Amino acid sequence: GGGSPQDTCKAIGIISNNPEFADVRSLEGLSPTNKPSVPILAIPTTAGTAAEVTINYVITDEEKRRKFVCVDPHDIPQVAFIDADMMDGMPPALKAATGVDALTHAIEGYITRGAWALTDALHIKAIEIIAGALRGSVAGDKDAGEEMALGQYVAGMGFSNVGLGLVHGMAHPLGAFYNTPHGVANAILLPHVMRYNADFTGEKYRDIARVMGVK
């Protein structure tokens, strides 16, 4: 499925082998589990979250109207089938929203303080792929859809190692409190956060502009 079904599956997989953490809220932050998840085979149906390759999962506490992140290297699926045909059923609006989520992953991962040479290479390539394919994917172009499937996966491999930034830090409460779709929340916040960070990330923003074809 998309990010939420895959994250739910990852939480269930962890709790199945670590029943002492049956209340998923006890896993918030850096999870203290001792045993790996039951084997998970992930098949993403959206091109955005990269939940199939990341060490974290996001859970919504509907009672408190908040989202919280659990980080656990035990929860990475053992196998991921990334097939763009599985993503064809997305309506254009969902393709746009999940695509912006993937782009935000790549941009935030590229400029985060923990970034290093390997993650920089992954993120800048992901930005290039996504920027070149997102519009075509939304319009229904199958080749562009395949590129989006690849780009979101590459971004996931990067940010899973270094984390994200202020966009996601604000998008989670915005989504939980106002029920704003996650990709839409990212789209609202990304331009403002990039402007806020511009004084400190100018060189990397130039890299981003270059691979996006901005002149």
Give each language-model segment a name.
Residues 8-13, 106-107, 130-133, 152-156, ...:
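Buried hydrophobic packing segments
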